[in-house]
Amino acid sequence: LDWEFNTGEYLKSSVVVSGGTAFVGSETGIVFAISIENGKEVWRYKTSLGIDAPPLVHNGVLYVGSTDGFLYALNQEKGELIWKYETNGEIMGAANQAVRPKSNDSVLVVGSYDNFVHCISAKTGKMVWTFETQNYVNGVPTIYDDKFVVFGGCDSVLYVVGLEDGKLIRSVEVEAPIAASVSVSEGIGYVGNMDRAVMAFDLESGEIAWNYRQKNFPYFSSPAVTSTHVLIGGRDKGLHCINRISGKQDWRFSARGRIDSSPVVAHEKVIFGSMDGKLYILTLKDGKEVASYEVGEPISSTPAVLDGRILVSCEDGNIYSFISEPGK
């Protein structure tokens, strides 16, 4: 352990790192900026309600959604408000940034509990388009091929819409609500649902490539995809490694608590937190435990992994920075 920073707040938001600073939001609506070097606070900014979503940093601006329904744009260095955009529902997932293919303007795409996905100008904070679903949108919309937005929501449908204009291109029934984000690689979308299934979809045809089912439990974790594997945490306390081609299980690791944390793959290792209060590091090849760090309180957030360092926020309000050897 290199350092820990106590926010004094309940934390569900994941830590995001940019330019030597770590950013995280708290359940009372405070955005903290913390120096990675020494774990000291750089600035803080207060929104009016809680923050569950991880921030997004792009071009010196921090974008963060709040349960007050606003997406805030803050100056990354000083934490000063640039603009805020109002949706009519809680924002529970991070925004994503993209450049529209024809208009060539930088936009943010974010889901809300008002049942809409909103596309917003990064510069002005004004609406570009909205797309209506039939229920809450929880996860981060995924940008695919620089022209499509892929997301699922609580209406049990996976959507592909045009980034330029927000028009529906394809929709696929996925049998149960989706709480997390869709991971896209080489034209295939991978997602876990609330009814024990992890699915792979061909985004061109909308056909299901495979459907991985275990016993009855939901997935709140977003999958990590490598060239050969799909990795996802489950409420069965398992980290599932699925063969990307066949959809069959390659291995499964058992933790002592459920895994809502989305795994991160780095240096042939898989890193994730569990509600058992541990941060785990496994080998990607066979799921053997390399190391684990006991923090003692539930971890539902996704770790931030950068050069020899792992940062993770914990529900007890602490942010922990662990030094790991490069390549380990």
Where are these regions (language model features)?
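Intrinsic disorder/low-complexity signal
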Residues: 1, 104, 145, 164, ...
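A short beta-strand motif characteristic of beta-propeller blades
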Residues: 1-5, 40-45, 80-85, 126-131, ...
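Short loop/turn segments that connect beta-strands within beta-propeller blades
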Residues: 35-39, 75-78, 121-124, 162-166, ...
